[in-house]
Amino acid sequence: MWISGASPLKVTGRRSPVRYASPIRALLAVVALVLIGQCNGALAQGMPSYDVTGFRDARFGMTEPEVRAVIAKDFGAKPADITSAVNPVEGTTVLTLKVASLDPGPGPAVVAYIFGYTSKKLIQVNVAWGDESNAKSDPNAMIAAGTRLERYFAGYSWSKDTTRAGIPVGPNTVVLFSGEDAKTGAVRLILDGVKYQMEREGKESTSPDPKGPPRLLINYIANRDSPDVAKIEKGKF
């Protein structure tokens, strides 16, 4: 995938060519991103494997008190800095922490720790940059951060034929990277709120202008196939 700027440049994803509107200075980083995406399979043998076990010191399977202690250690957060809520659809409990900065993303970030409906233990962590209320967010800074993270994840080997890079999944949303480990874990790196051009079968189409500022999101998932969320048993209705 390529991300570019004032003059949209060609963005070549793992499956579909895409173009982005964003500053020219992102071009070199994006070219590197594309090459990494295309060569990931060929280079995987010489790369260390990535095991999706959580985020920083927060490990999947930890209880809420354990994760709260880890948050305090990782970010110097106080109990009052952490909010707790229940997802009414999935039945999961979510601990949320806002941090003033988190490299490589620009500006503040939000880290959400999700606990399973049945197990009450950590099953997913989401890290997000970009505030929907901040219309002045710099798209180039968000794209640059996404490029750095894509290159980071692409530097590891993943389960065969599971990696994807530069895949449009919505009018203004692109999966910069996704990969699955040898067990049940998965990572998703998503860029939202960007305008791009996509080339398919020799024809180009342009996405609509984004309705909000750019956002960058990482999902660390413990069980990609069978998440611990509230479900209605088969045959109940």
Question: What residue spans do the PLM features occupy?
Answer:
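N-terminal secretory signal peptides that target proteins for export/translocation
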Residues: 1-23
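C-terminal segment of classical bacterial N-terminal signal peptides
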Residues: 33-42
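Non-cytosolic coordination micro-motifs
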Residues: 45-83, 89-90, 124-237
